[in-house]
């Protein structure tokens, strides 16, 4: 247990007080619930992602919430709660892909840029500045649309969203690593 006391987020929790501690713990609990819902989606969701009937009876379309469908159903007769729970899994995959890819690519490019310098450094920084000049959400949406050519495959959707978010966040890692290398 002594090993964990020096972890940055444990120190932050121990040092925070009042409203700051409440907000920090609330955020951690929400993230924990989200991650657990994504991991245990097959156990938590009452129906599968695309299930539109149970016991041979089709679900009603656009049904209001009731005991069987806690959040109602969609136009296509799909359970909304099940789709929300399964969607958290897709979101978690996308987050993992984009964070890992951004971290590795940004660190690699930052090391190259800071170490070699010169014309390569100027080009990489100019590209990073160009990416910064666009609104990040708009850039990510446009890139995801351009990259998603699979027509509905969950893997293709996760990868296109992950790559588009990666492109938006790479310049941040690049700048931080580059500045540390150049010191």
Model-derived segments and spans:
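Perimembrane helix-loop junctions in membrane proteins
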Residues: 45-52, 149, 179, 183
């Amino acid at each position: 247990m002594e090993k964990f006391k020096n972890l940055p987020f444990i120190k932050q929790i121990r040092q925070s007080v009042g409203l700051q501690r409440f907000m920090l713990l609330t955020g951690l609990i929400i993230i924990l619930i989200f991650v657990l819902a994504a991991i245990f989606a097959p156990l938590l969701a009452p129906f599968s992602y695309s299930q539109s009937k149970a016991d041979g009876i089709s679900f009603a379309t656009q049904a209001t919430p009731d005991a069987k469908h806690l959040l109602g159903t969609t136009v296509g007769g799909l359970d909304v709660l099940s789709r929300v729970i399964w969607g958290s899994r897709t979101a978690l995959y996308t987050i993992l892909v984009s964070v890992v890819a951004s971290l590795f690519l940004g660190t690699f490019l930052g090391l190259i840029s800071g170490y070699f310098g010169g014309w390569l450094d100027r080009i990489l920084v100019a590209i990073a500045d160009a990416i910064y000049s666009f609104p990040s959400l708009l850039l990510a949406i446009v890139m995801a649309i351009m990259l998603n050519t699979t027509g509905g495959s969950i893997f293709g959707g996760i990868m296109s969203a992950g790559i588009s978010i990666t492109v938006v966040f790479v310049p941040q890692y690049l700048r931080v690593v580059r500045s540390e290398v150049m010191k």
